[in-house]
């Protein structure tokens, strides 16, 4: 069967830049799905996207579907013919329905019954006949939140469609897609080459458009932007901040990227750089430049969509546009400094945190008391912790945070520094929100750790206390994410404290506001312990490893983490699978019949294998017990791995359920001693293979 290259392009008005890449990928996926469902073989489907177009190149696609046979089932052979071998009325009715004669019949075996059938040859449809509907269906299935209809068109799309190209090699496939007749004419850059571009062959697409100042390949366009931005940054000994989402958006805004470096007045560098970066990235789509120390430099890079004969005009235009935005940030910053942070508590007293839990000032005072209590656990200075907690939410009333909400905490840090607060206090104001997401950094200061922990605990316990725990997909206070943050703060700072102790401390701040302390405590502890799985699955830890540790229900997150790490390491040992299986066998035996009280009686050990296992246990126990006491669980399990050989020998040569009651009891005690050594770390019997 012959193979062809197909080009499809949908030309539109400017597509939403934040959706362009998603639309391209979805169009590719839906088309691949359609081709597969139609039974059309192909080598690849390449996808392209630029501001005014979505396109696909289907390489080496079949010219048509393969011919097939369709089976139509008739009556059973026994019911199809009479005693003389003539067709019965049932068979005649089947043949009449299919429009066939006796000589066109076949039979097939349906279980134990042989049945009559008709095998109809079905000729495969051509690519030309199938492709238009495949593409239209793909377009209909794109993830478009709000579709629009343009002019008299009956079809809807994310933006008005202007032209459609559909080529099979050098031939146009006759089709109407999105109410537009397909052809072989595309269009170049809106300003540099607005005239029509006729495509002679599907393979000419990318090259023809580049001659018309359009880079249709998204990745190539993006790589060009990255190269240009790096070159411009290198020229001033700086590094560009290039967030992935901003890079995607800028790539989606230009057909012919030309990066240009501009400047702004150095006086604006006195403003928190986070505010300047935010306004330049979010509002202007600029790439900001920083030096080796991470300090913002008085430059920015804009990516133009035209190759200007006078680029200085574009540069000056962007400098003129950005200046008012930087001036606004400067104004907010200076205005805020007229009112000390501590004096903002009156405004916090008028801002509701949660209707039943009070205002933000109520929350601040609770956090302050909790932070003082937590200081003995975190090692923070109680006075610093209390002061930082009382100042923590004050910047929420500032004009800078009002304009740039993402600067909450960060703005407070700047204002606290200006007011002369020490590093622990000022840094804690920004660190209180860390970690913000999975894998995010943690606070560097002890005070920051304390406030971050206190803030999360106060919210979690309070929300549980008023009966508004997360349900299903509803989690308005992001308690699931917050709980993982609490676990990380405890574990990664090596805080030796139980979850229940922390919940109790948080409950003290609520007093009578929380009516049922016992239920709140139980629910909050269970919720936090339930987040272990999400935390460790993000790290790639297997579920059975977690189950092995959870079987012991450790109370301390730090202790839980040490056990998880130990079991994770244990799984890598060559003895692990055999020891897990042996532990499972031991657990099953002891579940059926518990070991009698008392120690193993050495005189009742008669078999060489049980004597050897007992001797090994006696030797390893005094080595392992100090390791367990020191919570060095990894070393403890590594030592216990040496028991594999004597355990295997024991089960190969010893009958545990002996007829002699004394021998049986002694062997059960021996297995219980073995089991207790392993379960002092985790229940390794639940490990899979």
Swiss-Prot record:
Keyword Protein biosynthesis: yes
A Pfam family this chain is assigned to: tRNA_synt_2f
Keywords, sorted A to Z: Aminoacyl-tRNA synthetase, ATP-binding, Cytoplasm, Ligase, Nucleotide-binding, Protein biosynthesis
Enzyme Commission number(s) from the entry: 6.1.1.14
Subcellular location, record wording: Cytoplasm
Any single GO CC term annotated in Swiss-Prot or TrEMBL for this entry: cytosol
Highest taxon, organism lineage: Bacteria
Main localization, broad class: cytoplasm
GO-annotated molecular function: arginine-tRNA ligase activity; ATP binding; glycine-tRNA ligase activity
Catalytic activity: tRNA(Gly) + glycine + ATP = glycyl-tRNA(Gly) + AMP + diphosphate
Cytoplasm listed as a keyword: yes
GO biological process, one term: arginyl-tRNA aminoacylation
Similarity comment: Belongs to the class-II aminoacyl-tRNA synthetase family.
Quaternary structure note: Tetramer of two alpha and two beta subunits.
Protein name listed in UniProt: Glycine--tRNA ligase beta subunit
Native species: Acinetobacter baumannii (strain ACICU)
Gene that encodes it: glyS
């Amino acid at each position: 069967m012959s193979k062809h290259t197909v080009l499809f392009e949908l030309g539109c008005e400017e597509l939403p830049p934040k959706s362009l890449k998603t639309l391209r990928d979805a169009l590719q996926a839906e088309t691949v799905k359609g081709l597969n469902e139609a039974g059309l073989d192909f080598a690849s489907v390449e996808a392209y996207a630029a501001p005014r177009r979505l396109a696909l190149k289907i390489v080496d696609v079949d010219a048509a579907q393969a011919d097939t046979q369709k089976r139509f089932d008739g009556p059973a052979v026994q019911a199809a013919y009479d005693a003389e071998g003539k067709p019965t009325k049932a068979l005649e009715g089947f043949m009449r329905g299919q429009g066939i004669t006796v000589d066109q019949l076949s039979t097939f075996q349906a279980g134990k019954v042989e049945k009559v059938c008709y095998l109809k040859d079905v000729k495969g449809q051509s690519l030309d006949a199938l492709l238009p509907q495949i593409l239209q269906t793909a377009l209909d299935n794109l993830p478009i939140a709000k579709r629009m209809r343009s002019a008299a068109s009956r079809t809807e799309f994310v933006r008005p469609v202007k032209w459609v190209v559909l080529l099979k090699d050098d031939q146009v496939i006759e089709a109407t897609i999105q109410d537009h007749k397909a052809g072989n004419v595309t269009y170049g850059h809106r300003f540099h080459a607005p005239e029509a571009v006729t495509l002679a062959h599907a393979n000419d697409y990318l090259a023809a458009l580049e001659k018309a100042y359009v880079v249709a390949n998204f990745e190539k366009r993006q790589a060009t932007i990255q190269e240009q931005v790096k070159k411009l940054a290198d020229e001033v000994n700086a590094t560009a901040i290039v967030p992935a989402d901003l890079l995607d958006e800028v790539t989606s805004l230009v057909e012919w990227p030309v990066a240009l470096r501009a400047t702004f007045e150095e006086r604006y560098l006195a403003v928190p750089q986070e505010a300047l970066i935010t306004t330049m990235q979010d509002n202007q789509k600029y790439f900001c430049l920083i030096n080796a120390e991470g300090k913002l430099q008085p430059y920015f890079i804009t990516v133009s969509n035209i190759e200007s004969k006078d680029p200085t005009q574009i540069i000056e235009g962007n400098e003129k546009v950005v200046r008012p935005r930087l001036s606004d940030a400067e104004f907010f910053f200076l205005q805020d400094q007229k009112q000390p942070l501590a004096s903002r508590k009156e405004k916090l007293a008028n801002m509701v945190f949660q209707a039943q839990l009070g205002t933000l000032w109520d929350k601040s005072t609770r956090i302050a008391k909790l932070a003082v209590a937590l200081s003995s656990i975190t090692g923070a200075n109680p006075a610093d912790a209390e002061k930082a907690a009382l100042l923590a939410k004050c910047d929420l009333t500032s004009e800078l945070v009002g304009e740039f909400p993402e600067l909450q905490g960060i703005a407070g840090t700047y204002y606290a520094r200006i007011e002369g607060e020490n590093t622990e206090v000022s840094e804690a104001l920004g660190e209180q929100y860390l970690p913000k997401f999975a894998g995010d950094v943690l606070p560097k200061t002890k005070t920051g750790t304390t406030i971050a922990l206190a803030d999360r605990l106060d919210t979690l316990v309070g929300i549980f206390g008023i009966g508004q725990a997360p349900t299903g997909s509803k989690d308005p206070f992001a308690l699931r994410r917050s709980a993982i943050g609490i676990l990380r703060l405890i574990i990664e700072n090596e805080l030796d404290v139980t979850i229940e102790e922390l919940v109790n401390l948080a409950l003290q701040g609520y007093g009578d506001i929380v009516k049922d302390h016992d239920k709140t405590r139980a629910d909050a502890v269970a919720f936090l312990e339930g987040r272990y799985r999400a935390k460790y699955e993000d790290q790639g830890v297997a579920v059975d490893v977690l189950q092995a540790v959870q079987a012991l229900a450790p109370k301390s997150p730090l202790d839980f983490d040490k056990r998880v790490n130990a079991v994770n390491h244990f799984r890598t040992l060559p003895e692990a699978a055999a020891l897990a299986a042996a532990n499972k066998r031991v657990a099953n035996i002891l579940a059926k019949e518990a070991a009698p009280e008392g120690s193993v009686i050495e005189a009742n050990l008669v078999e060489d294998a049980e004597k050897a296992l007992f001797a090994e246990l006696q030797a390893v126990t005094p080595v392992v017990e100090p390791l367990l006491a020191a919570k060095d669980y990894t070393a403890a399990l590594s030592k216990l791995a040496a028991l594999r050989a004597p355990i295997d020998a024991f089960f190969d040569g010893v009958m545990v359920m002996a007829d002699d009651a004394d021998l049986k009891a002694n062997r059960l005690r021996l297995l219980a001693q073995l089991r207790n050594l392993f379960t002092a770390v985790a229940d390794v019997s639940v490990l899979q293979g």
